[in-house]
């Protein structure tokens, strides 16, 4: 059998031990204030403490002391209460500080809850806004409540008045959250709207009236190391949320073309300066928290169990860094960056490379670009193993073996690099050097035979003419 309330009672007992200072073996100092806790609870709740305590696991007899200067004592009090009770008191004043501290301590669950809290307060879509501000005559003068509404309300929150053309009802004294501004409260633009768009927009602005319900403390699910407590509504509010989902599905059947959507977007109302300043301030706090989260040290051994769910089963992770690949061959190639292995040597110069394509590119650009070949044996030749030969106006290169066969191996080659070896005239060359002499003789003999034939024909014609004249 499984008892669902066992872990709740266990957390309560641990929290009671912490408050009575029983078996506390970890001391945390923040702004000069000391907090006492159990290292096992901190180890299971925070990636930072997991790394810190795993390095000092040998000194189990003495208590561990850690000092933090990156967040305030009130912020750490809220986080420590969350660790031991599963309840996170979030509000518009402390959500950024709590998120920054959770980022530093590597508490991913608290970060996700803070992001959801901020998103719900800033990025409410049009459907939720219209459903939130469209109330019936029965709700006149009543106070509404929404998700995390208690955390946003302040004593100086302004009252809003709203009149609807459909019902003609008047709502006064409604305590709205400061970051949210209704579209119906903004002044209309100068451009008139199309009648069809107005009718379709009215159909979207007529949801069922919402009945406000008393607020209660409900934890947001079972998270690792606890859960965040936020202000939610009772069962009636849950039913109203389900009704809103059904109406949202019905509203999806209304087809609005792309041009109409662009027209509606072009006729939007300007935002109030109060909302713009609040959104800019929140955006700056969020960016600061994200930068702090990116600046955290990377933990390999201590925090190896954190974030493993984000890596799919079909990926391979590098044991030296956070790089992940899809194929095992890519991981093997990536490991050469850490090991320094270069398994691909160049046969021409002996230089080694980590990747085969780098070797191929090196060979093509260095060794095969302007490749020199011996004119006689057709083998590769360099400036060291060959010599440039000039035969009249023609220049080519021969290797030392071919030069030795031609009898030019004793010639002094101490010339400049640009000065070629000039061959002697044809009548002074040796027969072994003139390797095309046979071809020239054959061509010359053929030409001589043709000349003889032509000469014989010419002589025979002249004799015939002389005989006729006689």
Swiss-Prot record:
GO cellular component: nucleus
Transmembrane segments: none
Boundaries of every BTB domain copy: 24-92
GO MF annotations in UniProt: DNA binding; zinc ion binding
NADP as UniProt keyword: no
Locations listed in the record: Nucleus
Zinc finger (C2H2-type) stretch: 316-338, 344-367
Cited InterPro entries: BTB/POZ_dom, SKP1/BTB/POZ_sf, Znf_C2H2_sf, Znf_C2H2_type, ZnFinger_BTB_dom_contain
Domain of life: Eukaryota
Pfam families in alphabetical order: BTB, zf-C2H2
UniProt keyword terms in alphabetical order: DNA-binding, Metal-binding, Nucleus, Phosphoprotein, Repeat, Transcription, Transcription regulation, Zinc, Zinc-finger
UniProt function note: May be involved in transcriptional regulation.
Protein name according to UniProt: Zinc finger and BTB domain-containing protein 8A
Biological source species: Xenopus tropicalis (Western clawed frog)
Gene name as annotated: zbtb8a
């Amino acid at each position: 059998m499984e008892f669902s309330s066992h872990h709740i009672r266990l957390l309560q007992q641990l929290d009671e031990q912490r408050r009575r200072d029983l078996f506390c073996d970890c001391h945390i100092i923040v702004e000069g204030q000391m907090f006492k806790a159990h290292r096992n609870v901190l180890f299971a709740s925070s990636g930072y403490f997991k790394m810190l305590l795993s390095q000092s696991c040998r000194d189990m007899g003495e208590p561990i002391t850690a000092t933090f200067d990156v967040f305030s004592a009130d912020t750490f009090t809220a986080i420590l209460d969350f660790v031991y009770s599963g309840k996170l008191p979030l509000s518009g004043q402390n959500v950024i500080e709590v998120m920054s501290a959770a980022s530093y301590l590597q508490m991913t669950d608290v970060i996700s809850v803070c992001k959801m809290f901020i998103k719900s307060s800033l990025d409410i879509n049009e459907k939720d806004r219209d459903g939130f501000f469209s109330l019936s005559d029965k709700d006149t003068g009543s106070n509404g409540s929404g998700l995390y509404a208690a955390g946003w309300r302040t004593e100086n929150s302004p009252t809003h008045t709203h009149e609807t053309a459909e019902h003609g009802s008047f709502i006064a004294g409604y305590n709205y959250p400061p970051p949210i501004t209704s579209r119906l409260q903004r002044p209309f633009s100068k451009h008139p709207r199309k009648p069809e768009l107005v009718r379709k927009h009215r159909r979207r602005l007529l949801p069922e009236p919402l009945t406000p319900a008393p607020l209660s403390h409900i934890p947001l699910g079972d998270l690792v190391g606890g859960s965040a407590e936020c202000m939610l509504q009772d069962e009636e509010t849950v039913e109203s949320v389900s009704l809103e989902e059904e109406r949202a599905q019905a509203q999806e059947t209304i087809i609005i073309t792309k041009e109409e959507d662009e027209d509606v977007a072009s006729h939007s109302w300007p935002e109030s300066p109060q909302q713009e300043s609040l959104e800019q301030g929140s955006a700056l706090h969020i960016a600061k928290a994200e930068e702090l989260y990116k600046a955290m040290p990377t933990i390999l051994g201590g925090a190896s169990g954190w974030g493993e769910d984000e890596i799919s089963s079909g990926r391979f992770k590098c044991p030296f860094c956070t790089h992940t690949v899809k194929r095992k061959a890519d991981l093997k190639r990536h490991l050469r960056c850490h090991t320094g292995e270069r398994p691909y040597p160049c046969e021409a110069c002996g230089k080694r490379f980590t990747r085969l394509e780098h070797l191929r590119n090196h060979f093509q650009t260095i060794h095969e670009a302007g490749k020199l070949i011996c004119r006689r044996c057709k083998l590769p030749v360099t400036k060291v193993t060959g010599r440039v030969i000039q035969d009249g106006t023609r220049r080519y290169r021969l290797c030392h073996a071919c030069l030795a066969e031609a009898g030019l191996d004793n010639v002094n080659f101490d010339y400049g690099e640009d000065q070629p070896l000039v061959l002697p005239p044809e009548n002074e060359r040796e027969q072994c050097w003139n390797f095309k002499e046979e071809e020239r003789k054959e061509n010359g003999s053929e030409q001589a035979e043709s000349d003889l034939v032509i000469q014989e024909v010419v002589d025979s014609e002249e004799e015939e003419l002389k005989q006729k004249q006689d």
